[in-house]
């Protein structure tokens, strides 16, 4: 679910950006900003699988046929998309895995440009279609996908069963479940 406001302590631009935005391939130099933006924009407490680890994002840099891009305003990451060729057992399907746009840049077609370029790169790599998943309450992302040619094909529910953990016998503290949630990743690591 997208957050409505920027958390306290996160710097925001005083005025809306006015410069020309550049679309570039995701590079190592963008990793920290991509993770920061993704975690600022998505509420990972509501939907834990919307969060990514550094390892998961960095893994895309070495992947063949990667369709991972950033939109830059100078050196500032205004938005990003992570896409890959293969979805579950379908090597001919592309997967638009994660997209986020800084609130300062929303309304400037940054997300649509990222979606279109990601899909074009996946098509060039041999994808016959591109799939993505959108949380039911994330109406802004659902509308973005519809505007860019996606149609709803299936509904999937995330079922969660909390498990009680016994207290450790050696006096050690129980594992940090919040840390576990932060490192819970999406389908790419979940299935492979």
Please report, for each region that a protein language model flagged, where it lies by residue.
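Active-site/acyl-donor-binding loops of N-acyltransferases
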Residues: 2-4, 148-167
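Conserved beta-strand-loop-alpha-helix junction that forms the acyl-donor binding cleft
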Residues: 106, 132-142, 160
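Conserved acetyl-CoA-binding loop-helix of GNAT-fold acetyltransferases
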Residues: 101, 107-120, 143, 147
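Conserved N-terminal entry element of GNAT/NAT acetyltransferase domains
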Residues: 1-29, 165-192
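Conserved active-site alpha-helix within GNAT-family acetyltransferase domains
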Residues: 112, 136-155
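Acetyl-CoA-dependent GNAT
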Residues: 25-97, 102, 115-116, 121, ...
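Conserved GNAT acetyl-CoA-binding A-motif
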Residues: 122-134
